[in-house]
Amino acid sequence: MHLTKQRGRQTEVKLGGLQKLTLLDYPGLVACTVFTVGCNMRCPFCHNALLVSKIEEENALDEGGFFAFLKKRQGILDGVCITGGEPTLQQDLPEFIAKIKALGFKVKLDTNGSFPDRIKSILETGNVDYVAMDIKNTLAKYPETVGIPGFDTSKIERSIKIIKESGIPYEFRTTAVSPLHEADDFEEIAKLIEGSQGYFIQGFKDSGELIRGEGLGELPEEELKRARDKARIIIPQTKIRGED
């Protein structure tokens, strides 16, 4: 893994992959998406399962190579999406983001909201232009949905508050998975993020590399629409990802 010398110490962000072009991940911008390695959650439906636990060193993305790529894309790409895994697990994420910003790119940060203090610190740097937080389920269903018995949902509530009050454009989103979600859950989820700028419901897609995919599937289209309509009771601008 490439190490960069900064402020008298070495910094390292573990990268697992790069999507060189996306027109979808960063709303309104032409961007690339970089994937960090490691996650504290074990959501059975995670479509990036290889990034959650470990990735073979020879398959990792070299940080130096990533920044060389960005320099070649200056004036072509508008932004960089940082996703995972869970990016806020990376100790040196603030420095990593600052280096991206120094090249003139806008930065979108994806997070599961597990580390509110880290999120607050990163957002306060002013280097993040857009943040997207996954709301996994209702608070009561969080432990089962993230694969961690006794998961502390107060951290999720704190992160929601921090993001809403940050002054930075943001969105909340939920991947709808059967049987973990039912349409009626989405009104309760919407109450959790009431007053938010935007809420997206995403249909589950089996990537073939799930953590534990047995018995999981998509919500039927009509059930997905009912979930959207339930959420719209609280957040009128709720959309299913991809719909007009």
Regions found by a protein language model. Give the residues of each.
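Conserved AdoMet/S-adenosylmethionine-binding subsite of the radical SAM
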Residues: 67-79, 88-221
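Conserved alpha-helical substructure of the radical SAM core
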Residues: 49-80
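SEC14/CRAL-TRIO lipid-binding/transfer domains and related phosphoinositide-recognition modules
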Residues: 13-19, 38, 51-52, 65
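A secondary-structure boundary/capping signal
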Residues: 35, 83-84, 111
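Canonical Radical SAM [4Fe-4S] cluster-binding loop centered on the CxxxCxxC motif
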Residues: 28-61
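Conserved phosphate-binding and hydrolysis motifs of nucleotide-dependent enzymes
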Residues: 43, 84-85
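Auxiliary Fe-S-binding modules of radical SAM enzymes
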Residues: 2-28, 165, 178-244
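Residues that line or immediately flank small-molecule/substrate-binding pockets and catalytic motifs
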Residues: 50, 84, 135, 203, ...
